[in-house]
Amino acid sequence: MNDEISDLINQAVSNILINSSSENKLKKLIKTHDVKIHFVPRNYRIFGGILQSMNIQFGNFLEEFMTLLIKSDGRYDILEEYSGKKSNKFQLSTSNDNRIDQFISFCQRSDSINLDEEFPKLLNEVKNDNDTNLSSISHDIDILFRNKETGVIYYLEVKYNDDHDTGKFVDINRKFIKTYAYLVREFPNTEIKPILFFFNNKKMKGNIYVPENTNIRRGKSFFDEFLKIKYEDVDSYIRNLSESPDNIKAFDDLYRKIMAMK
């Protein structure tokens, strides 16, 4: 693993620790928890909340991290105009909007849907839609990259872990499919492959909206298919970093700092 990648990980961990323990943040947390009635001591609640915040920040960092890995591989171009941007301007037809919502509802009702057949059919209908009744949409894109040799564009929706509750899980998949609809209108003459990517290998439950084999990649499977760097090397580096004396000391110091707060 090259120095640029390891430096990015180290800097991200350092930034997360600093952001999570700033005096301003701690004052806000004290104010929030002072007015709550709870059997768990206040400072323990604050520490638990900070750990949860760190988890969220690490998930957000993964977009930047995966972008660097893809860019440094050499075989791909990151579409900088769209990738990582939070307010891209797109258009969505009324028919595609309804078509995707109906597909989501159908998947929820059906016990026997064949996603390997129905999902590609949906994507094809979305791509070939000619409805001119359009709505303008401001929308974020996690990662968009192009294979230099084939010209295929890959849309990557990045998630840290497959552990979302039911409501959020539905929203993730709906957003994933609608983003594809935005992109095929933006790039009408280009093959676009949407991939729902989970950084961890863990599979919590089956996806009833998106086929596992063609449009979902988990941890190692994405690295093996798209990247020269090995997933095991990244996994090992982060695990070793998490258990390093310096990192453990940083968390011990944070714990003592919070427990000493009045």
UniProtKB/Swiss-Prot annotation:
The EC number(s) this enzyme carries: 3.1.21.4
GO molecular function, one term: type II site-specific deoxyribonuclease activity
Keyword Hydrolase set for record: yes
GO biological process: DNA restriction-modification system
Enzymatic reactions: Endonucleolytic cleavage of DNA to give specific double-stranded fragments with terminal 5'-phosphates
InterPro entries xrefs: HinfI
Major enzyme class: hydrolase
Keywords assigned by UniProt, alphabetized: Endonuclease, Hydrolase, Nuclease, Restriction system
Name of the protein this chain belongs to: Type II restriction enzyme HinfI
Encoding gene, per UniProt annotation: hinfIR
